[in-house]
Amino acid sequence: MCEAFPESLPHGPVAVNVAVSAFKEATVTVISTPQEYNQEDLYIDLEAITGHQLFLKCEGFNFAGSVKLKAATAMVEAAERDGLLTPDSILVESSSGNLGVALSVIAASKGYRFVCVTDSRCNLSARLLMEALGSQIHIVTDPAPVGGLLGARIDHVRALCASDDRYVWLNQYANPNNHMAHYRTTAPAIARAFPDLDVLFVGAGTTGTLMGCARYFRARHRRVRIVAIDTEGSTTFGHTPSRRMIPGLGTSIRPPLLDTSYVDEVVHVNELDTIRTCHRLARHGFVFGGSTGTVVSGATQWLAQREEPVTAVAIAPDLGERYLETVYQTNWVQDLYGGDALQPRAVAVTGPTV
């Protein structure tokens, strides 16, 4: 079996809340599987750091360390309900790191075998974490003539599926459960916390988080402006592909999930600016991943070009521990980007390109 596109969609994990009494009453959360827990309502006020009122929704406080746990949980549970996964199935997925870790967590919890097809840009810590969880890692090194390393990863996944019908490819790039996970969880949580929201900044990778949030706000809160944050060198919004070294946001193949009619603006961020933003946040005690650095950088630049005050939220997809050997390593940064890597640099704000 190669691809799983289940029609039924999940309602997401639910934690069990119980009250215990010992001298005073306390509320605790009890779970039996790692995918049941996700810190949904944690925001950081970044005004003191960025100079603009910007609230950062932290999505990395779960057992997978990133927003990808939501999509992974939704896709696996839907495939189970639709009978696409059996005890003999082998999950396989192309991932630059975060979804691979999330699927590794779920596979370990449920007893599935999992093969993550990644490439040389995947951080070592992410690979080691997946292996610690019992997953197999296949690393693609040669880019495909069309689609680059992502295209090569997908080709490898298809070859595995063709070789053994036990493989089940959830296909995060086209699976509707990817964006519906955020339509049902992430977006409503933001709407509840910020009923007067003006603008939402969302990073664009597979575009699952982007499309789930964009579709929700279009349907229920049309006034909210959706600004997609992409990385320079990504082809997602029609730009010419170029070298990208930081895994996470950006693609070399336009994601099938993307519908640009739901996107109001696009900000493209240079990787140098991503690195500078990560370091700036770290100087204030917040160590975030490259995807979060890109989102905060793009949001800050967009806000700097607006004179009127707005209520703005940005989604932080990940934390920074998996980037300690890259984004936060001086030698790595200087080898790839030069000695002036921490000098300020502007980013471009554009309308969506179809």
Please state what every model-predicted region is.
Residues 1-354:
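PLP-dependent amino-acid enzyme catalytic core
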